[in-house]
Amino acid sequence: MKRNNTWLWRFLIVGILLLVALLPVTTLAAPDWSACVVDESSKRVPGVLVRESYQNYSAESEGHEEDQYSDANGCVHFAPKLTRASLLRRGIQIAYSAMAGVHASFGPYAYVTAFQGDALGDDVRGGYEYAWKGSPRHVDSSLVLRSH
């Protein structure tokens, strides 16, 4: 009789762990993001295509994009984006990402870019293009259009 109880407890524990692994977890995939497009003289530029690109490499295998055009003040606003995935899915995705070796990416990653003709606008901070990697929850960007 004692042997049956042991198997019952093992089965119950495995079932609970599996259930927990399948529960979805919601995390922030991209922040609440405000961006203004300016030219090289810092004048705001309306009507410019601004693209937000984002992906949570630890929870999903495909990236996402949202496009908006800058308003009369040269600005756009992107609402925060959420990713919903189970712990099991996240574990599988992390293992899959790790197979990329030195090129592996993990966690949330987002950035914004402006496009107008042959000009591109990026948020450059300290000489590097800014990319959001999980925090803060709100980002303000200035995208400087430069011809390429």
Question: What is each residue range found by the language model?
Answer:
Residues M1-T6:
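Short, Lys/Arg-rich N-terminal segment immediately upstream of the first membrane anchor
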Residues L8-D32, C36-D39, K43, R51, ...:
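Beta-strand-rich domain onsets/edges
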Residues L22-P24, E65-Q68, V102:
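Beta-strand-rich interaction surfaces with strong enrichment in secreted/lumenal proteins
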Residues S34, E65-D67, C75, D123, ...:
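Well-ordered beta-strand positions in beta-sheet-rich domains
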Residues V37-G47, A72-N73, Q116-D118:
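A short, structured loop/turn motif at beta-sheet edges
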Residues L49, Y54-N56, P80-L82, Q116:
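A mature extracytoplasmic/lumenal domain signature
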Residues S58-R84:
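Short, acidic Ser/Thr/Gly-rich low-complexity loop/linker segments typical of extracellular
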Residues L87-H148:
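Beta-strand-rich cores of mature extracytoplasmic or soluble domains
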